[in-house]
A protein has these predicted regions:
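Class II aminoacyl-tRNA synthetase-like tRNA-binding/catalytic domains
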Residues: 2-120, 128-132
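A generic secondary-structure signal for well-formed alpha-helical elements
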Residues: 34-41, 150-161, 320
């Protein structure tokens, strides 16, 4: 079911031409900074992959992929990607990327089951990145180091935007706050996971929640994760809590809520994959191409994630609807209401 937040007194700070220029400047500047911070080289990525190889991502495990038959391959089914987490790991192996270096790509996807609204579109564009690591770097401390570098690139980009458009004021705090999903649940035991995100992000401005996908002490998960990319089950000795992954959120004063900008994490090794397949009841995946490659040791240890391009632009340019940043399909009633409210959808 679609939703629409209509911010009181909303007025776009940039017109259409300024917005288009701003989008280009943000994308060029941020990806250059991301590449420099994490030592990533750009690679070309697929829009679709063959079905049944375990390469496409299942996200929360329930979304349907857009698919179509390929005539020249005997009507074999191809799927439009959800994201490229597993494809990137295969590419690290193919390019023989050493620890300390990685890849990034412009990822375009279609998520047909998305609930449409201010922050959610059928069309997804993000920087998908992946970096080879050593076994010693599979820790929460290393995860935090990478998150901090990404956040530094975000703050530099914000400075550039505010210099280009003085009517836009900076909003990101100097530092990002880290908290485990278990600690967050203990802090706000009476709130739902989404309400906890809003509460903690409003307090700190920018937050990274660790351990997305692991079972908390109340028997629930903060959110679901597919079992075969992020490692959400390994216990970190420094915290004695499970999970080497998480979500990066910032506070959006326009929409008066938290916004997830990135989902990322240290990826499963052989032991974590086997454990998470058992926990999720999906041991049959061991027979898929990607999973066989991981289990036979031919894929590198890595860390990676995705960073939403349209959401990042939306926040920097202080827009109220993601449709002010990207071209997509929206319910006619939503288009009408947005026009009445000053949200000019592309």
């Amino acid at each position: 079911m679609s939703y629409l937040i209509k911010p009181k007194g909303y007025k776009a700070l940039l017109d259409l031409k300024q917005t288009e220029l701003g989008i280009k400047q943000i994308k060029d500047f941020f990806q250059q900074n991301l590449s420099s911070e994490l030592r990533l080289r750009r690679v070309t990525a697929p829009l679709f992959v063959l079905k049944g190889m375990g390469i496409n991502d299942d996200l929360n495990g329930v979304e349907r992929a857009v698919s179509f038959p390929i005539k020249d391959l005997g009507d074999a089914q191809a799927e439009v990607v959800h994201s490229l987490a597993k494809w990137k790991r295969l590419t690290l192996a193919e390019y023989n990327i050493e620890p300390g270096y990685g890849i990034y790509t412009d990822m375009n996807a279609i998520r047909a089951d998305e609930e449409l609204g201010n922050l959610h579109s059928l069309y997804v564009d993000q920087w998908d990145w992946e970096r080879s690591i050593t076994a010693e770097q599979r820790t929460v401390d290393f995860l935090k180091q990478i998150v901090t570098r990404i956040y530094s690139a975000m703050r530099r980009t914000e400075y550039m935007v505010c210099e280009m458009y003085p009517q836009i004021k900076p909003f990101l705090p100097h530092d990002i706050h880290f908290i485990h999903a278990e600690e967050l649940m203990q802090k706000y035991p009476d709130l739902s996971p989404k309400e906890r995100e809003h509460a903690i992000t409003k307090e700190y401005g920018a937050v990274f929640i660790i351990g997305i996908g692991c079972e908390l002490s109340n028997g629930e998960k903060h959110d679901n994760r597919a079992p075969d990319y992020d490692d959400y089950s390994t216990i970190d000795p420094s915290t004695n809590l499970p999970g080497l992954n998480g979500d990066l959120l910032v506070w959006d004063a326009i929409l008066d809520r938290s916004v997830e900008l990135s989902s990322m994490g240290i990826r499963v090794d052989k032991e974590a994959l086997l454990r998470q397949l058992v926990l999720s009841g999906q041991e049959h995946r061991k027979e898929l191409y990607f999973h066989k490659r991981l289990l036979d040791g031919s894929l590198p240890l890595c860390i990676g994630g995705g960073i939403g391009q349209s959401r990042l632009c939306m926040l920097y340019l202080q827009k109220a609807h993601i449709g002010e940043i990207q071209a997509s399909i929206w319910p006619e009633e939503m288009r009408r209401e947005c026009a009445e409210w000053g949200m000019q959808l592309i």
